[in-house]
Amino acid sequence: MGRLLRLEVENFKSYRGHQIIGPFEDFTSIIGPNGAGKSNLMDAISFVLGVKSSHLRSTNVKELIYRGKILQRDNTDFTDSSNPTTAYVKLMYELDNGEQREYKRAITPSGATEYKIDEEIVTFSEYCGSLQKENILVRARNFLVFQGDVETIASQSPLELSKLVEQISGSLEYKSEYDKSKDEQDKAVNLSAHSFNKKRGINAELRQYQEQKTEAERYQSQKEKRDSAQLVYLLWKLFHLEKSISSNMAEVTRLKADSIQLIERRDENTKEIEKLKEKEGSIRRNLLAFDRKVRKQEKLIASKRPELISIAEKALESKSNLRKIQRKAAEIEKDYSDQASTLQVLENQLTSLSAAEKEFLKDMQEKEQLKGLRLLPEDKEEYEGLRSEADKLNSNLLFKLQTLNRNIKVTSQSKDSLTSIVGDLESKIKSLHESVSSLDTERADLLAKINEKIESLELEKHDQQKKRLTYSELFHKTQELNEELQSCLQKILEASADRNESKQDAKKREALYALKRIYPEVKGRIIDLCTPTQKKYESAIAAALGKNFDAIVVETQAVAKECIDYIKEQRIGIMTFFPMDTIAASPVNQKFRGTHKGARLAIDVLNFESEYERVMISAVGNTLICDSMTVARDLSYNKRLNAKTVTLEGTVIHKTGLITGGSSNNRSAKHWDDHDFDLLTQTKDRLMHQIGEIEYQKSSCVITESDTVKLHSLESEISLLKDKYTVVSRSVEDKKKEIGHYESLIKEKQPHLSELEMELRNFVKSRDELQIQVEKVEEKIFSGFCKRIGISDIHTYDEIHRTFTQSFTQKQLEFTKQKSLLENRISFEKQRVSDTRLRLERMHKFIEKDQESIDNYEQNREALESEVATAEAELELLKEDFASENSKTEKILLAASEKKLVGKRLVSELTKLSGNITLLESEIDRYVSEWHAILRKCKLEDIDVPLREGSLTSIPIDDVSNSGDITMGEEPSEPVINFEKFGVEVDYDELDEELRNDGSESMASVLQEKLREYSEELDQMSPNLRAIERLETVETRLAKLDEEFAAARKAAKNAKERFNAVKQKRLQKFQAAFSHISEQIDPIYKELTKSPAFPLGGTAYLTLDDLDEPYLGGIKFHAMPPMKRFRDMDQLSGGEKTMAALALLFAIHSYQPSPFFVLDEIDAALDQTNVTKIANYIRQHASSGFQFVVISLKNQLFSKSEALVGIYRDQQENSSRTLSINLEGYVE
């Protein structure tokens, strides 16, 4: 193989000007710093070898021309105004024979590329062909690996790998031819299959027509039998129809004669009922007037009751307050009375004390004079001298006596004080016992009041809870009714959107409601009493009813007249009434039933109660509802039926032929929706009435402010009473404790009192002894004095004088003390009485004020009660008058009811007779129609019926209206019946005696069964009567298809052979490459991955998804590094993937290898060990026939190369520059 010698570039990418790069040895490494232009060198090699610019990191070739700035010496850069507009890359290649060849690719100023071989311009195809001869495949790019291609190959899908092998093998060039021949084969095969299927279908059709020929012959024989049986059945049917018509006509004549008598009796009874109705109408008007007055009076009473309840509640509250104030005033008055009594007692006591004091002074003066205690001055002087002498003699005794008297006095005072204390304690105990007794009584009263108030509170709570429960129930019920009302209002709102009711219509509707309330005999509008059987008939029925649509149905003519008078009085407008007792209704013409399958009588598509049948017949008559305008025109204009026809859209064809109406102006059909709207309105009124009643009931269950105040008042009173009860109970307990304390004090002081009494007795005894001694001395000294002044002894004088003086002083002191106490007590009690009187006066003012309010409330209540009583009395009188008038109505109604029963019985009998007549006439009409229909069928189907007279040609093809055949006047006594035969007399001689005598259903079933059997056999045959003609046509087509099938089969065979030839070429090419790559991949991978530790290396192999046509499927690449289990490629590490991808690249390159292999940084993702392995592999396989050019940044790789091309950046020129060195002369 040849080899790459050097490159010459000029103005290509980062290489400015003309530069020579090389020479390139068997293993040349391109090194240099990042950004120096290594990859641009790779792009230059790719460019000169014909690779598209899109693979060279550019969108067009002009971008490959050098563009750069030149740095000047003064460190300023400028753009060269003469930027190059052309560029080229030249590759010097040495052939096997040593001859050199020059490949050059240039970029012209226009942006085009120019290819030259040895400076001779060639085409791209010639250029690529020359390179291909040297195994340099431009499209497969088997000579280079771009930066990142290794990682891309490692992550390729099986289909992408298969496509890569196709490119390498050259089988891809057969793809378009393969696809084209495959399409041609598929089309040819499909055409052949289609021809075969057509031939098979024609064969089946041929067999079918052969079978149909036999079937047609058998069908003709069976048809003759069926026609014979049909003729017998039709003759039997015609015979018995004529027989039934004759017998029914005789029966109709008899029944109509009977009905005349019933009509006369019915008319007499109706006149009597009319008279009663006139009376009833007058009384009913009076009842209506009374009813208005009663309602007005009830409304008046109802309006007064809330005010009456309010006044009663206020009066009750005022009375409660008054009772409280009165109780408080009574307590204050009692206190005032007690205080006044106490004051009076105290004043009486003061008066008595003053009188006693005066009496005492007077008494003391008298006693002093009586006892002679007053001495003369000289006697008194003598007495004083003698007393001084005696005192000197008795000084020691007197000292002792004074000491004893002092002790007696002290002891006596202590005893008196202690006695007083005990007395006070006893008095307090007595007072406390009285207070405890009073408090116990008060506590019992309080407890009774508390229980009474609690009972009242519980009763009030129970009443309020009952009100709450009732209110809650009514509230929930109101909610439910409101929800239902809301739903109803929503429906009314939705219906109102599509409803356009005029004021006049609304007025009429309200008038109808009023008439129904006044007159029970008012049944309602015709529209409300009937509904179409299906919604599609609504417009048609509305048009059929016409002006009778809003007509009102009443029981009698008398009621109708009263209703007319009412609407005249109210000025409502025009309204039509149908009295049920006098309405005239002609029977429905039965012949119209079955006239056309697309038409039916209007009366037959209405649902209504049986009692309204005559009304409905009178309203719609013989009107026919037609499915379409075509049917309506056919019946009205072609068949000339004497009846009104209406289409489903509401278009009316009148008897006169005039056409009116239609869906555009027929709004009457919406009145059925109006009926639903009326029901919704009635429901709304009912719900609102119920809600109003509940709201009225709720008003009586509402807990008013007075109820709350009353409850709080009771609770407050109970709380106060309980507090007072607690205070009283605590006071009782305190007083009992105080009694116990006082009793214990008395027990403590009693022993001390006894001791003082004993001590006092001893002192008195000692004093008496000393006193005797003193008296003896004094008797000696005062003996002469006593005799002179006339006293027995001096001791008596001294005792009387001393006692009198002491008694006077002590008594006078007691009077002063008691007077002071009474005066202070009186002053205090006077102040208390004054304060209590003021409180009492205020209470009396409050009582007067509340009493005045109560009197006002009572007056108002009595006035309202009087008004209510008067109104209720008037209401009772009105009700009595109403009842009186109602009793008159009931009597009239009873009499009218009896007459109505008679009338109903007569009407029932007449209806029964009319029904029988109608039924018989309907049967006659049906029999006649059926007789005509049979003959019409015979005429249309060419059935040869034997005739004695006439011809079937006289029978009209279209059905004829029975309005001229069977008619009724106003009374059933005027029958006009005619059986039109059109001059035809059927000959029944062929009908045997048994069939003439037996007209039963069983005979009909036998004849029909026999006819049905023949018909079913004929129906099952379904012969093709043109089978013989079609058989010849099919045979001709079959011969033609045989020729087409042979040609299609031959074309399919040729297409398949062409396809197999292309397929085989593509398969051989692909299989050759795959087999080679598959054989090489494992040893190459082993060589790349082996090491001293793992001398065998790893394992790699390829598998095909599709063994028959492998290029249609994928190729799976499996690699197992040394000493590792099998894994998918995406589970290998980055280095393992790179090694596997390189092994695959080397294996692919080994198939039709190019003379040189350019690799761009394939070692980027490898560690040092794997880089060394790659370097060793390249070193071992680099030779004169297999040249490696490697771009690398790792010294483990480029250090193994034979030559180095260094690339650096010339900053001054702003261009990439190269340096080359041969390493063969250097020792490793």
From Swiss-Prot:
Q: Return the InterPro entries for the record.
A: P-loop_NTPase (IPR027417), RecF/RecN/SMC_N (IPR003395), SMC (IPR024704), Smc1_ABC (IPR028468), SMC_hinge (IPR010935), SMC_hinge_sf (IPR036277)
Which SMART domains does the record match to this protein? SMC_hinge (SM00968)
Could you state one GO cellular component term attached to this entry?
cohesin complex
Where along this sequence does the record place binding of ATP? 32-39
Sorted alphabetically, the Gene Ontology BP terms of this entry are:
cell division; chromatin looping; mitotic sister chromatid cohesion; sister chromatid cohesion
Molecular function terms from GO? ATP binding; ATP hydrolysis activity; DNA binding
What's written under domain?
The flexible SMC hinge domain, which separates the large intramolecular coiled coil regions, allows the heterotypic interaction with the corresponding domain of psm3, forming a V-shaped heterodimer. The two heads of the heterodimer are then connected by different ends of the cleavable rad21 protein, forming a ring structure.
What is known about what this protein does? Answer: Involved in chromosome cohesion during cell cycle and in DNA repair. Central component of cohesin complex. The cohesin complex is required for the cohesion of sister chromatids after DNA replication. The cohesin complex apparently forms a large proteinaceous ring within which sister chromatids can be trapped. At anaphase, the complex is cleaved and dissociates from chromatin, allowing sister chromatids to segregate.
Assembly state and interactors? Cohesin complexes are composed of the psm1/smc1 and psm3/smc3 heterodimer attached via their SMC hinge domain, rad21/scc1 which link them, and psc3/scc3, which interacts with rad21.
This chain belongs to which protein, by name? Structural maintenance of chromosomes protein 1
The record's gene field reads: psm1
